[in-house]
Regions:
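Conserved acidic/glycine
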Residues: 1-55, 243, 248-249, 253-390, ...
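Acidic, glycine-rich active-site loops and adjacent beta-strand->loop/helix elements
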Residues: 73-78, 114, 151-157, 179-185, ...
Length: 669
């Protein structure tokens, strides 16, 4: 056994005792969790930290209460080491309401706002972009904090790893990336998954200074972590610490462990960090007779108390099932601070830009980031001139890494900033769907209400510009399917101008879909000093005979169709959804109650569409108001083609809306 004190700082006896106590505390907690799992007290997946305790103990000893921690699904030890009380962690393992996430997260999703513990993350590599965003928020606010991000060797194969380290190095952010390299990603050996098995070289290639340390030696880990934390606190940018470690137990309780040799496991157990430190302390006269037994007794008592309290704690009542999906927005939304007092003649592009300028001028927490939004001025020129006006810290060009910078936006929102993330086009958002759906939409719920995500994501959507199948789809209904997200689709100049301010006042993640065919459209912007209500649909044209229901880029076509129908003696009411999630069902049902017929115009595909959802709502809630079948006008079910005539044929056009309206009125077969 190597001497753990060689090449390391001299530590006091009290300090070494504390390191030993912390490792023992984590080990005993995890062992008890295994027992409780076999008794079916803990369910789901259980990933224990047994064998790896030296990593968390050594690194986290150097963190302060203001520093942030982002972890993995094997995070029980990190949570305990980050000052979350054991009783709250154990209650969460049980799924009880007294747990640190109110029982909503369970073993893989421990959170605590007071401890600045931003969660276990069950998506491999999913926490790395969040850590980047937390550090970015601190840097923008001038706070001297560090974010420690723990992950395994498997995460180093994920795109999020490369995107996150690149962003952190590019922006010189105070992130300590801690790779707990236990040689296996679930059951896949490092050598089978990585052509380059020296993980420090991956970090160095991305511009992050890196070091590798024996992760079974708590003193060595602490010393390496302290060196890196010193550099971080000095403003020297991110650091990468690889800790070579080993888990003594299976990946999870369902793992038969057929992929590693028993002799290998036993060889690593010979390097167990707990006896390694304890035996060295005994030989050095630093661990006195009876002291370890006393530590074990204290830990056992704490553990028994935590289990007893978890057993006695209440389950969250079913009546609260729908809690923690959204944070309640303010009942009174502050009006836009820079609302115009006179009408303006302008384009939708200019209206969107006015909204951005207002947000940046009147809320110092707001910043904009995305691809080509600064020097280039935005793919659709919405942000042109903003870099010169607000500077590169707040108009932040990003690499082509949608998942990375969107996740960083989510992390920045967790860190008290108000980010506006621009994704160039909806098709590119699919590269960020992991972070949008698995993080932005779920963090409030998984944390039991501990962490909201006040984030705005803007993106272009829709077809009509002859840019074919990878830049042209209308996929907003996919996001409207997801609880935890709010989805907006402006179709008027007033909404283009004022929706952003309202979205920034909302404490939830808000996605704004800007139809590409609106950017060049011009009109008169009437002043709206009270702002817009992003909870409600809007009646854009009253009528008594037929409800035309639409949103976004289809609104101008629908209004044109309504005008043509009026010439035929049909008074159509035009309902602009504006808000795709949560839908304003009351306005929809009320409109149908007046007109008794409905045509839904939706640029998405018909199968699984928003139009289908609205039709179902009307059938469920207003069936007896219907005098005719509901009609849907949607895009033909093909990828958007390039040729102009085929693209036009695929998309809903005024003639299609008119034909559907006439069928609903019984005037056309």
């Amino acid at each position: 056994m190597n001497d753990v004190s060689s090449h390391k700082p001299r530590l006091s006896r009290a300090h070494l005792l504390e390191l030993l106590r912390q490792m023992l505390r984590v080990r005993r907690f995890e062992e008890r969790c295994v027992e409780l799992y076999t008794q079916e007290k803990i369910r789901g997946f259980l990933h224990v930290y047994i064998g790896e305790e030296a990593v968390g103990t050594g690194v986290m000893h150097g963190l302060g209460p203001e520093d942030a921690v982002v972890s993995t699904y094997r995070e029980h030890g990190h949570a305990l080491l980050n000052r979350i009380p054991m009783d709250r962690v154990m209650a969460e393992m049980y799924g009880k309401v007294t747990g640190c996430s109110r029982g909503r997260g369970g073993s893989m999703h421990l959170f605590d706002a007071r401890a600045r513990f931003f969660g276990g993350n069950a998506i491999v590599g999913g926490g790395l972009p969040l850590a980047v965003g937390l550090a970015l928020a601190d840097k923008l606010a001038g706070r001297s904090r560090v974010t420690a991000c723990f992950f395994g060797d498997g995460a180093a194969a994920e795109g999020a790893f490369h995107e996150s380290l690149n962003l952190a190095a590019l922006w010189q952010l105070p992130v300590l990336f801690v790779c707990e390299n236990n040689l296996y990603a679930m059951g896949t050996a490092l050598r089978l998954a990585h052509a380059q098995t020296e993980l420090t070289r991956k970090a160095e290639a991305l511009g992050v200074p890196a070091e590798s340390v024996d992760g079974m030696d708590v003193v060595a880990v602490e010393a390496a972590g302290a060196r890196m934390l010193e550099a971080l606190r000095a403003g020297q940018g991110p650091r990468f610490l690889e800790c070579r470690t080993y888990r003594f137990r299976a990946h999870s309780m369902f793992d038969p462990e057929l992929y590693r040799d028993k002799a290998e496991v036993e060889a690593w157990k010979e390097r167990d960090p707990i006896p390694r430190l304890a035996e060295w302390m005994q030989r050095s006269g630093l661990l006195h007779e009876g002291e370890r037994e006393a530590l074990e007794g204290e830990i056992a008592a704490e553990l028994e108390q935590a289990v007893a309290e978890a057993e006695a704690a209440e389950w969250e009542p079913e009546a609260s099932l729908l809690d923690h999906v959204y944070r309640a927005p303010p009942t009174w939304s502050p009006p836009p601070p820079a609302a115009e007092t006179e009408p303006l003649d302008l384009s939708f592009r200019e209206a969107f830009r006015l909204g951005l300028i207002e947000a940046l001028e009147h809320d110092e927490r707001v910043f904009l980031m995305g691809e080509d939004i600064g020097h280039y001025g935005g793919c659709y020129a919405v942000s042109r001139g903003l870099l010169e006006r607000f500077g590169p810290e707040r108009i932040r060009d990003t690499p082509l890494s949608e998942n990375g910078f969107t996740g960083a936006g989510i992390g920045a929102a967790l860190g008290e900033a108000r980010p506006i993330v621009e994704i160039m086009t909806v098709n590119f958002s699919l590269l960020a769907m992991d972070q949008i759906v698995n993080s932005a939409a779920t963090l409030l719920h998984m944390s039991g209400g501990e962490f909201g995500v006040p984030l705005v994501i803007r993106m272009a959507t829709g077809a009509g510009r002859q840019v074919a199948a990878q830049h042209s789809h209308s996929l907003e209904h996919w996001y409207a399917h997801v609880p935890g997200l709010k989805v907006l689709a402006p179709g008027t100049l007033q909404d283009a101008r004022y929706m952003l301010w309202a979205a920034l006042q909302d404490p939830n993640p808000v996605l704004i879909f800007e139809h590409v065919m609106l950017y060049n459209r011009e009109g008169r912007l009437e002043p709206l000093p009270q702002g817009v209500d992003i909870r409600r649909a809007a009646i854009r044209r009253p009528g008594r005979d037929l409800s035309l229901i639409t949103y976004g880029g289809s609104l101008p076509k629908t209004l044109e169709a309504a005008e043509a129908l009026a010439g035929e003696g049909i008074e159509a009411e035009v309902v602009d959804l504006r808000v795709l999630r949560p839908l304003d069902t009351a306005t929809l049902v009320a409109s149908l109650g007046r007109t008794h017929r409905a045509v839904i115009v939706d640029e998405g595909w018909k199968t699984g569409s928003l139009a289908g959802e609205i039709g179902a709502i009307l059938a469920e809630q207003a069936f007896w108001s219907l005098d005719a079948p509901i009609e849907r006008v949607c895009t033909d079910e093909i990828p958007i083609p390039y040729p102009r005539h085929l693209e036009n044929a695929a998309l809903p056009q005024v003639e299609d809306i008119l034909a559907a309206a006439r069928r609903a009125m019984g005037a056309e077969p």
